[in-house]
Amino acid sequence: MSKPTVIVIFMAILVLGMATKETQGANCVNYFEITFPEVCEANWCAAECLKAYKNGKGTCWQKFCQCVYDC
């Protein structure tokens, strides 16, 4: 193989490795508004996030349930 061919292959592998590294570990966030009861309950929030999103984690914020999950 010639030198330019080796460099092109190396650069392609490098770019592909960087592209996959950027997409790993990205988190998305979604919010559920609480209508009843008036205050968010931690157990309900966690269960709803797991039901809606695989590996979702729920956190209560007054009248909202915040779900953080892998994109």
From Swiss-Prot:
Q: Where is the signal peptide?
A: 1-25
Keyword Disulfide bond applies: yes
A Gene Ontology biological process in which this protein takes part is: defense response to fungus
| Keywords carried by this UniProt record | Antimicrobial, Disulfide bond, Fungicide, Plant defense, Secreted, Signal
Instruction: From the record, give the cysteines joined by S-S bonds.
Output: 28-71, 40-60, 45-65, 49-67
Cite the InterPro entries for this sequence.
Answer: DEFL (IPR010851)
UniProt keyword Disulfide bond present: yes
Q: Which Pfam families match?
A: SLR1-BP
Origin superkingdom:
Eukaryota
GO cellular component terms attached to this protein's record: extracellular region
Location relative to the cell:
Secreted
Record PANTHER family: DEFENSIN-LIKE PROTEIN 122-RELATED (PTHR33830:SF10), DEFENSIN-LIKE PROTEIN 184-RELATED (PTHR33830)
Identify its protein family: Belongs to the DEFL family.
This chain belongs to the protein called Defensin-like protein 124
Q: Which organism is it from?
A: Arabidopsis thaliana (Mouse-ear cress)
